[in-house]
Curated annotation (Swiss-Prot):
Family named by the database record: Belongs to the NPY family.
Function, as annotated: Hormone secreted by pancreatic cells that acts as a regulator of pancreatic and gastrointestinal functions probably by signaling through the G protein-coupled receptor NPY4R2.
InterPro entries: Pancreatic_hormone-like, Pancreatic_hormone-like_CS
Localization: Secreted
Keywords, comma-separated and alphabetical: Amidation, Hormone, Secreted
Protein name (database record): Pancreatic polypeptide
One Gene Ontology molecular-function label: neuropeptide Y receptor binding
Amino acid sequence: SPLEPVYPGDNATPEEMAQYAAELRRYINMLTRPRY
């Protein structure tokens, strides 16, 4: 199963936050995708 992305912290750079947001979206999509 996919691993939950780790929050980079309040001092993260905008690039790190964007990467985290993208990984989190992908993670949630994998969790909520219907399994046929």
